[in-house]
């Protein structure tokens, strides 16, 4: 059995910082790197395999040949040749825009192929860093439009001081924003549909205001108010700790100080492992050993049965 590693796919943004290049141990002088697309099947931004017999092939080319052997029978029937998840690292040197993503139904009505549900795992944060998630008070669509116009929409949003290990589930329709000083891993549907609600009246490098999608967002927003949007969980060493389980993905975190065997023989899905701290190795049932250290994301095909992870390493595990 072979696991897949991928070439870096870095995105420079007006709000990006310098953490990603260091975190991924890259030799690069790029600045303002806001995102690393770790595993992507988004057309035009497809990950390229960096190892083994598939080296140089895109993820979508591998999927077209391997089909259900890569993603699992149910997933292949459900998603076809569209890889279902997009994995990112995000480094916010400045605040990102206030935004929302549509669900699949609304996305289809607005001419988009798929909506977007996602989750955030905070890998690191500067002192005072925060995330904006969800509505903290009830507002109507009319009040929403007024608050965007008079620059008070942030007053309606939950604001969370964050630290390493914090987790937030962001289903389609939930308003959110990543704020300066946050360094996160993002797991999401394979979609790049974002409706920008508010951007602090900032201008791009050409002196233009960035496009807003206030009207489209109004239709997509879920106006439900929750008491707390932070995921409540208690991490346990050397065990799987569930973070999120929804129809689109299931994610757990592992914090290992001793070897652990992961049995996927009954799972009809690919598995992605995302190293967020430390280093170790992955041993497959066929006897192959792969290095695995922070900043790396690896894809295990659905044919994987058992792997052993060794080392002092914290990583996320996600599958569909």
Task: Identify what each model region corresponds to.
Residues 1-139, 199-227, 251:
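Transition-metal
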Residues 87-88, 96, 118-121, 159-160, ...:
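His/acidic/aromatic-lined binding-pocket segments of jelly-roll/cupin-type domains
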Residues 80-82, 90-95, 104, 125-128, ...:
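Ligand-binding loop in jelly-roll beta-barrel domains
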Residues 147-195:
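Loop-centered beta-sheet repeat module
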Residues 138-150, 268-279:
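Short, basic/aromatic beta-hairpin or loop at an interaction surface
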Residues 157-169, 284-304:
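Short acidic-glycine-tyrosine-enriched beta hairpin
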Residues 261-262, 278-283, 297:
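Short beta-strand segments in beta-sandwich/barrel cores
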Residues 195-267:
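C-terminal amphipathic alpha-helical segment
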């Amino acid at each position: 059995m072979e696991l897949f590693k991928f070439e870096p796919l870095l995105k420079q943004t007006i709000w990006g910082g310098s953490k990603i290049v260091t975190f991924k141990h890259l030799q690069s002088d790029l600045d303002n790197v806001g995102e690393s697309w770790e595993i992507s099947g988004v057309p035009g931004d497809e990950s390229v395999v960096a190892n083994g017999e598939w080296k140089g092939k895109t993820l979508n080319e591998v999927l077209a040949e391997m089909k259900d052997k890569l993603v699992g029978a149910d997933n292949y029937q459900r998603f076809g040749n569209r890889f279902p998840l997009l994995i990112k690292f995000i480094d916010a040197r400045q605040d990102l825009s206030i935004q929302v993503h549509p669900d699949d139904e609304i996305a289809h009505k607005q001419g988009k192929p798929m909506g977007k549900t996602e989750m955030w795992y905070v890998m690191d944060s500067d002192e005072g860093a925060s995330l904006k998630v969800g509505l903290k008070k009830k507002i109507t669509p009319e009040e929403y439009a007024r608050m965007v116009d008079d620059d008070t929409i942030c007053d309606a949003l939950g604001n969370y001081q964050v630290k390493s290990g914090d987790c937030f589930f962001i289903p389609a329709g939930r308003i959110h924003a990543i704020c300066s000083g946050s360094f996160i891993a993002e797991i999401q549907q394979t979609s790049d549909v974002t409706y920008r609600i508010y951007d602090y009246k900032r201008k791009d490098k050409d002196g233009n205001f960035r496009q807003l999608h206030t009207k489209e967002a109004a239709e997509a927003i879920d106006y439900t108010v929750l008491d707390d949007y932070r995921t409540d969980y208690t991490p346990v060493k050397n065990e799987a700790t569930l973070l999120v389980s929804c129809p689109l993905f299931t994610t757990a975190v592992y914090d290992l100080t001793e070897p652990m065997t992961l049995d996927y023989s009954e799972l009809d899905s690919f598995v992605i492992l995302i190293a967020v701290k430390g280093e170790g190795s992955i041993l497959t049932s066929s006897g192959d050993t792969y290095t695995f250290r922070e900043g790396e994301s690896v894809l295990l095909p659905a044919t994987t049965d058992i792997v052993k992870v060794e080392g002092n390493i914290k990583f996320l595990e996600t599958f569909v």
